[in-house]
Structure formats: structure tokens, C-alpha cells
UniProtKB/Swiss-Prot annotation:
NCBIfam families, per the entry: PRK00197.1, proA
Localization per record: Cytoplasm
Keywords: Amino-acid biosynthesis, Cytoplasm, NADP, Oxidoreductase, Proline biosynthesis
Reaction equation(s) it catalyzes: L-glutamate 5-semialdehyde + phosphate + NADP(+) = L-glutamyl 5-phosphate + NADPH + H(+)
EC number(s) on file: 1.2.1.41
GO biological process: L-proline biosynthetic process
One function term, GO molecular function aspect: NADP binding
Organism for this UniProt entry: Zymomonas mobilis subsp. mobilis (strain ATCC 31821 / ZM4 / CP4)
Name of the protein in its database record: Gamma-glutamyl phosphate reductase
Family annotation (Pfam families): Aldedh
Pathway noted in the entry: Amino-acid biosynthesis; L-proline biosynthesis; L-glutamate 5-semialdehyde from L-glutamate: step 2/2
Gene: proA
């Protein structure tokens, strides 16, 4: 292979070869003891720490290229690795290694009147293809979660993170080899050739599931072109609604965190809805706190009247995942008005209410049809790690199979085991 070209195999042939190796590895992983899978993750964590200088050097190449290409500050932040972020990756691996293994768990058990014993147990999905963009940490998170859930994975990261992904991938191979597991259990597409994405999406019968992690255009392409099942992680067009009975002290603290803690993650609040019954002076204080934190406010004419710094909001803004220090703001008449706005514009990821009225909060929690609905908490808690699931492979916003943070359990299916003593089914 030279540069970004595939010299000896077509993209379809290359992907088929990787998938066949992954299938063989998945059969071994499906039977691997929990301790062996956990050992591979702990050894990978150790490798990340030992090779941190090499990983950061590789990442510096990607960051320099992104900056030379005048990529957005949000994109560069998602791409950039630091010693602290590497340590977080290593620590996450150790957390996942100690999570309960879902493989083999009994979901349901029953005995039929004829004596048949039926058991429904969790099993790995098989071979999972993961397509993602600028975040290098997905290489480790995705590999760890697929491995611990007994699946083999084929990773196709974004071209902007190619050097970072290759460096991180080597630590995973080292962990697998030292633990005595097949290195083909986790494979990284080694080229930036976009044709490999198409080959993955059409590898029906070879790849069991594709998970896209990235922006709207990536997810849309995957959903349109895929000939294999897709578990989609869509935009995080998240709302925080300040009810008229909200505690102003909580509001300011939570809303600033929900927007500004890390603006480039999918759990960041993108739209702020404020009840008209909430005190105007507290609204001014909240907006000023956001400005002080470096946030650009885009508001309706009413918002601009009380906040001269605010820019005019457009219709397009309400449906935009900024992933940046920008927030759309408007007043709503009451909770029903807030619910109507959320139903129209939310991507079904995470929406939150701030109020001291439990009855109102419970109605909001029951009414909003999003994967995650919160009360008096920052939307930035929309994360598998914060849910106690370890790392996550994404936030699924669909309604079939997994929903919300997808961790180990979300990467399994199930099968029925039937134990008999010679029963036959009577002729009807």
C-alpha cells in the first residue's frame, strides 16, 4: 500500500479480507473468558501510558494539518490529545475492564408445561464496523467496548486523525497480543481512501452492524448507502428549559456548564428556553454569565431587548448543532410551549428542565421523547461514563435496539437456548 492508494486489492476485496479475519476472531472472542478480555484492556492502558510521547507526537501532526487547513476551533479541540486526555483514555479502559461482562447473562428463563426449559441469554453481535470522524479517543473507546462485549471491530477513523488513530491502534494490538487474543479482533482501516467506507457499508453478510460517529452528513450517508444494519448516533440538538419555578442559583451554574464546559461534545446544550414567568433580572444575570464565559448569544427580538450583546437568531439556528460557544435563546409562554418547541427541533438526544416543582418536572420527563431527559442537571452528563457504563460508543437516538448511551449491553444481542428431554410437538 502506498500513500492513500490500494495497490493490490480493490476496496471491496480489502474490506472483505478484513471482515473475514474479524469473523474468525469474533468466534474466539465470543468464547473468551471475561478475565482474558479484561486483561487485554488493562495491558492496552499500560501501553498508552508507556507510549504517550509517541502518541502525542503523532497527534501533533494531525493537529498541525488541521490548523493549516483552518479547521474550526471546535474541530481542533476534538482532535487534540493531551497527557490528561490520554490518562483519561487509559483510566476508561481500566474501568471497562472491571465492568460486568454481558456475554452469557441470563435475560429470561422459563419452563413450559411440556417440560421444555427455555433460557434467553446475551450473546455478541459479531463483527461491527465503526466509522467516525475527528475524535481519536473513539479508537480506544470503540475497541474496548466491542472487545469486552465479545465482538470484533473494524475501525475507520477520519482522515484528519489518521496518525493519532494509528498510534493508538498499536497500543490495542499490543494489549491483545499480550493477553493471548487474536490481533485481528480489532482492525483499523490503514488508508484514508473513502472507497473503504462504501465497501464497509455494503459488506452484507460479512459485517453485522455499522455504527457511525460523526456529523449529520456522515450519518446521513451511512444511513442512505448502508446494506447492513446501522446504529445511528445523530446530532445533539439539546435543550435546557428554565421553568418559572427554577432556582436561579442552580440555573446559572447548570446552564453555563451545559453550554460551556466543553462546547464540542454532543451533550452540550445548543438551545436555551426561558419561561416568561422567570424573573427578568435573573434572565439578564444568566445571559451575562454566559457572555462572561465566552458564549455568543443568538436570541429573538425579546432577548435582544434585554441583552444588547445578543445577535439575531435565525430559523436555521434552532436546528443547528453548533459544537461551539454559540447558544440560541428564546422565551416560551409555559411548559407546553417549551414542549412544542422541543418536539419540533430536538434531535432526540438530550433535553433538560430546571425547576423546583416536582410535578412539572415529572410531566417534562414523561413528555419529552428523547433518549435522555434530565431534571436539574447539566446536559453534559449525557455520557456513558457518567451513567456508570464505562465509555460509550455513542448516544443512540433511534427507537430500535439500543437507545441513549450505547455501552457493553447495547453491543449484544440474544439467543434462546431450549433444553428438552425428548419432547416432540404434536400434530395440530
Amino acid at each position: 500500500m502506498t500513500g492513500n492508494k490500494i495497490d493490490q486489492a480493490t476496496p471491496t476485496e480489502m474490506m472483505a479480507g478484513m471482515a473475514k479475519k474479524a469473523r474468525l476472531a469474533s468466534q474466539i472472542l465470543a468464547q473468551a473468558p471475561t478475565a482474558q478480555k479484561a486483561e487485554a484492556l488493562v495491558l492496552t492502558a499500560d501501553a498508552i501510558r508507556r507510549h504517550s510521547a509517541d502518541i502525542l507526537a503523532a497527534n501533533a501532526q494531525d493537529v498541525a494539518t488541521a490548523e493549516n487547513n483552518q479547521s474550526s476551533s471546535a474541530m481542533v479541540d476534538r482532535l487534540r490529545l493531551t497527557e490528561a486526555r490520554l490518562e483519561n483514555m487509559a483510566s476508561a479502559l481500566e474501568v471497562i475492564a472491571h465492568l460486568e461482562d454481558p456475554v452469557g447473562q441470563i435475560i429470561d428463563k422459563r419452563t413450559r408445561p411440556n417440560g421444555l426449559e427455555l433460557t434467553r441469554i446475551r450473546v455478541p453481535i459479531g463483527v461491527i464496523g465503526i466509522i467516525y470522524e475527528s475524535r481519536p479517543n473513539v479508537t480506544i473507546d470503540a475497541a474496548a467496548l466491542t472487545l469486552m462485549s465479545g465482538n470484533a471491530a473494524i475501525l475507520r477513523g477520519g482522515s484528519e486523525a489518521i496518525h493519532s488513530n494509528k498510534a493508538l491502534y498499536q497500543t490495542m494490538r499490543e494489549g491483545l497480543a499480550k493477553a493471548g487474543l487474536p490481533e485481528e479482533a480489532i482492525q483499523l482501516v490503514p488508508t484514508t481512501d473513502r472507497a473503504l467506507v462504501g465497501a464497509m457499508l455494503t459488506a452484507s453478510g460479512l459485517i453485522d452492524l455499522v455504527i457511525p460517529r460523526g456529523g449529520k452528513s456522515l450519518v446521513a450517508r451511512v444511513q442512505q448507502d448502508a446494506r447492513v444494519p446501522v446504529l445511528a448516533h445523530l446530532d445533539g440538538i439539546n435543550h435546557s428549559y428554565v421553568h418559572k419555578e427554577a432556582d436561579p442559583e442552580k440555573v446559572e451554574k447548570v446552564v453555563v456548564n451545559a453550554k460551556m464546559r466543553r462546547t464540542g461534545i454532543c451533550g452540550a446544550t445548543e438551545s436555551l428556553l426561558i419561561d416568561r414567568g422567570y424573573p427578568v433580572e435573573k434572565v439578564k444575570s444568566l445571559l451575562q454569565a454566559l457572555h462572561n464565559a465566552g458564549c455568543e448569544i443568538r436570541g429573538t427580538a425579546e432577548i435582544q431587548k434585554i441583552d444588547p450583546e445578543a445577535k439575531a437568531v435565525s430559523e436555521e439556528d434552532w436546528g443547528t448543532e453548533y459544537l461551539d460557544a454559540v447558544l440560541s435563546v428564546r422565551f416560551v409562554d409555559d411548559m407546553d410551549d417549551a414542549l412544542s418547541h422541543i418536539a419540533r427541533y430536538s434531535s432526540g438526544h438530550t433535553d433538560a428542565i430546571l425547576t423546583e416543582n416536582r410535578e412539572v418536572a415529572e410531566k417534562f420527563l414523561a413528555s419529552v421523547d428523547s433518549a435522555i431527559v434530565m431534571w436539574n442537571a447539566s446536559t453534559q452528563f449525557a455520557d456513558g461514563g457518567e451513567f456508570g457504563l464505562g465509555a460509550e460508543i455513542g448516544i443512540a437516538t433511534g427507537r430500535i435496539h439500543a437507545r441513549g448511551p450505547v455501552a457493553l449491553e447495547g453491543l449484544t444481542s440474544y439467543k434462546w437456548q431450549v433444553r428438552g428431554t425428548g419432547q416432540i410437538r404434536p400434530v395440530a
